[in-house]
């Protein structure tokens, strides 16, 4: 069906973005000395924050340029189509630019490198190496993996559920039934609310950018306790998500503040775990361990997409809050708060 096809393409999109981004995290760790890695990951987060804000506002921007914001039932509005098309072009262009413009330092002993590459080639060896590295993961990587699970489950919940949850709960304009008598009026109100949600979501990109700027300034001059910063950042995002439960059409302006808090956690998620991890793994295994670490990003999103969000949200509603779409945002907040608590138990001996 069309729904399953859309879900399938969403998974492919998510997987391709994660796979293409992973080598760049390893590249940051490879190119920078240990003392500057926190700084490098934070700068990367700053750039991601700028992109997040621009992307979140693309539907609104192309609407101003004349793209239609409404569509018949079962069709995609022009504003959404053009926003995704622009995003695809920028994504491919930035990947190609980085690939062709970034140099990598050659191995110190090229002959030894080529010899080892020849000995260790083949699919079976690659599978065996990954399996052995998974079994031998450093303890801090396992601990961070649990934190990453809750963090990325929360954000996938936001990406997939924020619009239907917030248009109805905060703006009082849920998506209308196709057989509604005044469908056109209700659909127009829904699309306006959806644009407002998208614009508000752009704030989390701005706040993550501002947070990254502060961290960039701070980490370039002083040592930081990355564990505490990450824990507090996740807690801020958790509060932002749960705050949404108490918003109404009269207080909808506060939605931007909710996303501002969420942006703080987003800025930390994209930098602090990698900065912590890069100090604990051998440089020669940086790529494979960063790849394995990426599994802790992909798995929660797969579980969420396959029904984890719906099941947990229904359990939360049946037990505490009653059945309502906004419960998905509360679930995201609970996940970030759990991640915040678990972060405090990570053993980090050094700072950078």
Regions found by a protein language model. Give the residues of each.
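C-terminal ends and interior cores of transmembrane alpha-helices
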Residues: 1, 235-249
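Hydrophobic core of transmembrane alpha-helices in multi-pass small-molecule transporters
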Residues: 1-20, 253-269
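Intracellular loop-helix junctions on the cytosolic face of multi-pass helical membrane proteins
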Residues: 2-11, 17-20, 24-25, 31-157, ...
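Intracellular juxtamembrane helix-capping segments at the cytosolic ends
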Residues: 19-32, 268-282
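Loop-to-transmembrane helix entry/capping segments in MFS-fold secondary transporters
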Residues: 34-44, 194, 281-293
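Loop-to-transmembrane helix entry
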Residues: 42, 172-206, 254, 327
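Helix-to-loop junctions at the C-terminal end of transmembrane segments
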Residues: 210-225
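A late C-terminal transmembrane helix in Major Facilitator Superfamily
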Residues: 283-315
């Amino acid at each position: 069906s069309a729904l399953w096809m859309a879900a399938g393409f969403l998974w492919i999109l998510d997987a391709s973005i994660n796979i293409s981004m992973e080598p760049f995290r390893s590249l940051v760790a490879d190119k920078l000395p240990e003392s500057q890695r926190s700084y490098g990951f934070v700068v990367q987060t700053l750039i991601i924050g700028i992109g997040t804000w621009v992307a979140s506002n693309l539907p609104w921007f192309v609407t101003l340029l004349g793209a239609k914001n409404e569509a018949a039932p079962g069709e995609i509005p022009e504003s959404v189509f053009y926003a995704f098309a622009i995003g695809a072009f920028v994504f491919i262009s930035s990947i190609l630019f980085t690939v062709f413009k970034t140099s990598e330092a050659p191995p110190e002993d090229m002959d030894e490198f080529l010899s080892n590459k020849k000995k260790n080639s083949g699919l079976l060896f690659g599978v065996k190496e990954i399996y052995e590295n998974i079994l031998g993961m450093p303890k801090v990587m396992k601990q961070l993996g649990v934190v990453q699970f809750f963090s990325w489950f929360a954000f996938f919940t936001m990406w997939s559920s924020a619009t239907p949850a917030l248009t109805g709960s905060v703006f009082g304009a849920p998506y209308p039934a196709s057989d509604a008598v005044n469908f056109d009026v209700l659909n127009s109100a829904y699309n306006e609310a959806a644009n407002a949600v998208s614009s508000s979501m752009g704030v989390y990109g701005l706040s993550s950018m501002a947070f990254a700027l502060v961290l960039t300034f701070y980490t370039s001059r002083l040592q930081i306790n990355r564990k505490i910063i990450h824990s507090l950042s996740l807690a801020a995002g958790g509060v932002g998500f749960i705050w949404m439960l108490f918003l109404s059409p009269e207080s909808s302006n506060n939605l931007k503040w909710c996303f501002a808090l969420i942006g703080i956690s987003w800025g930390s998620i994209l930098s602090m775990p990698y900065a912590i991890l890069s100090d604990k793994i051998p440089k020669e295994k940086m790529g494979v361990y960063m790849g394995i670490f990426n599994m802790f990003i992909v798995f929660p999103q797969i579980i969420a997409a396959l029904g984890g969000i719906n099941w947990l949200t229904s359990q939360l509603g049946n037990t505490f809050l009653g059945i309502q779409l906004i419960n998905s945002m509360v679930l995201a907040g609970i996940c970030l708060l759990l991640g915040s608590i678990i972060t405090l138990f990570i053993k980090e001996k050094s700072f950078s």
